[in-house]
C-alpha cells in the first residue's frame, strides 16, 4: 500500500500505523521522517482517536459498551479474547440495526492490538461479515472500514491544530444499504458522540 502511494505521488512516504489486510479506509502516511516520528509518538500515546465501521449478522451479546480483555494467539493465525486484563485490548462501541438481522457497529479502539476489532466482535457472537478467519458469513468483502481519524498536530512554533478526517466506505454492496447511509448521518462526527461509560 505504501509503495503504491509512493508511486502514485512520486515522493517518499513513511508508514506510521497499519491496517489489518482485509480492512479498507483511512491510513496516515508521513512525508518526512520528522513527521513520522511525531505521529508515531501520537499513536503510542493514544492521542489519535480512530473510529471504525463494521457490519455483522446476528444478535450481539450486547448492543453497545466495551470489550476488554487480554488477547492470545490461537490457531490458524487467529487470536482469542481472554478473561484476564493484564495488558488488555480495549474497544468501545455502538451499534444500530440497519436491516433484518444485520447491524452496523461503530468501534473505537483504545489500544492497538493485531486483529483487535475482529476478535472483539467475534467475542460478542457476531463475527464481521465476510471475515472468513473468524467465522463471519460469506460476503463480497470483509466489512471492516477505518472510518474516521481525529487528532491534534503541530508544534510550539507553528501552533497546534485539530484535524478530523472521514472516509465513507464505497466498496461493498452492504455498505451501500439505506440503513447504513442513515446511520452514518447520525455518526457523522464520532468524536462528539456520548460514548458508553465503562461498565456498560
Where in the sequence are the language-model features?
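A generic structural motif
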Residues: 57, 96, 108, 152-154
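Active-site lining segments that contact anionic ligands and/or coordinate catalytic metals
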Residues: 102, 114-116, 144-146
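Short histidine-centered loop motifs in beta-beta connectors
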Residues: 101, 105-108
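Short beta-strand segments enriched for Tyr within beta-sheet-rich domains
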Residues: 39, 113-121
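An acidic site on a long C-lobe helix of protein kinase domains
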Residues: 18, 111-113
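RNA pseudouridine synthases
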Residues: 1-90, 94-100, 143, 170-176, ...
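Pseudouridine synthases involved in rRNA/tRNA modification
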Residues: 120-200
Amino acid at each position: 500500500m505504501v509503495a503504491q502511494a509512493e508511486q502514485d505521488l512520486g515522493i517518499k512516504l513513511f508508514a506510521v500505523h497499519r491496517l489489518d489486510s482485509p480492512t479498507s479506509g483511512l491510513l496516515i502516511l508521513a512525508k518526512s521522517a520528522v513527521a513520522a516520528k511525531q505521529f508515531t509518538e501520537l499513536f503510542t500515546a493514544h492521542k489519535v482517536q480512530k473510529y471504525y465501521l463494521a457490519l455483522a449478522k446476528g444478535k450481539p451479546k450486547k448492543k453497545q459498551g466495551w470489550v476488554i480483555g487480554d488477547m492470545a494467539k490461537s490457531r490458524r493465525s487467529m487470536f482469542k479474547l481472554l478473561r484476564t486484563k493484564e495488558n488488555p485490548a480495549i474497544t468501545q462501541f455502538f451499534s444500530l440495526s440497519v436491516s433484518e438481522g444485520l447491524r452496523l457497529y461503530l468501534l473505537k479502539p483504545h489500544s492497538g492490538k493485531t486483529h483487535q476489532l475482529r476478535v472483539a466482535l467475534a467475542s460478542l457472537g457476531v463475527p464481521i461479515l465476510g471475515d472468513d478467519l473468524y467465522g463471519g458469513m460469506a460476503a463480497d468483502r470483509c466489512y471492516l472500514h477505518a472510518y474516521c481519524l481525529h487528532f491534534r498536530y503541530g508544534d510550539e512554533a507553528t501552533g497546534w491544530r485539530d484535524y478530523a478526517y472521514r472516509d465513507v466506505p464505497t466498496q461493498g454492496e452492504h455498505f451501500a444499504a439505506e440503513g447504513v447511509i442513515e446511520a452514518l448521518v447520525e455518526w457523522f462526527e464520532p468524536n462528539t458522540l456520548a460514548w458508553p461509560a465503562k461498565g456498560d
